[in-house]
């Protein structure tokens, strides 16, 4: 291997590392809402529906931002987008810490930070990493996007301990400052290679209008299978689990610290599951792999229904669900690259992420409304089980086709 090639490889892995960190901070800020729900509701007198609406509204703004951001990645690269997304996350979360009314919290967390969540996001990271790798692409995407869980593995259990000694507002300020501090670091250290700049300029010059590229996607059966399975992915992960697992665990009688430890354990296995799924996506039939992930995730909800009073079952669920949580991301990104083309990878992943966010909005709000109406989460888990099984069936309908060689569609 030549010195120049070694430097290129090192540069590509540096991008992977800082993409990991960006997702770690962004996703930790997003998921921390589930941890502060109880103290925030007690202080402000809000219902579970009101606090769940903040998560749901944030997902809607993520959905609105995702395709636009994805299109911008294709044309301008990820450096500015990741750093500005982190700045929006940090600023929004700091403002949310000072909220005293629901509209103030919605504006700061759901709108400002929500747009940041949709910008410093897995679809941006998976796109920039895919464009920097040919060999070991699935592994690289798996490692980079594992930041979405890696940060939560560390931050959420620590935050739970901090909440034992201070209020939720102080904790939120600390998270926001972390995001603001990382934003300029990402901008300075994720430097595009000369070849990447030239390729981006070529894509910009050759790029068809966004409407034409969207038309190509909407005519593709593969896109619809990926989109609707990813919509369900949002319901069953960011929707019901990210927003409601810790409150549900506390409702079942577990202390907040124990509940957050279980969430941290889930994220530990989540991280490993993402890397493993990325590695497997380079080696086996990807539609079968993706479908199996959804089905096994769905079956884990059966365990969740019976955790009350049984710490062993809580741990068992955390391990099983963790392995099959975000492990859909690298496999979905790999299929998007091979079946829909690298030239519109950003737009494709943006559209898929929009679907995921809309599903998460449905799941988060559904959990809050059903809990307020029925004083139980059981129907939430039943819906999650059924929809996850449906997502698996959708993925089995996708044809494996590696031989297309990451082709770019003619309309792009």
Region spans (language model):
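Residue-level signature of mid-helix packing/kink "hotspots" within the transmembrane helices
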Residues: 31, 59-67, 153, 267-275, ...
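Cytoplasmic helix-loop-helix junction between adjacent transmembrane helices
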Residues: 110-146
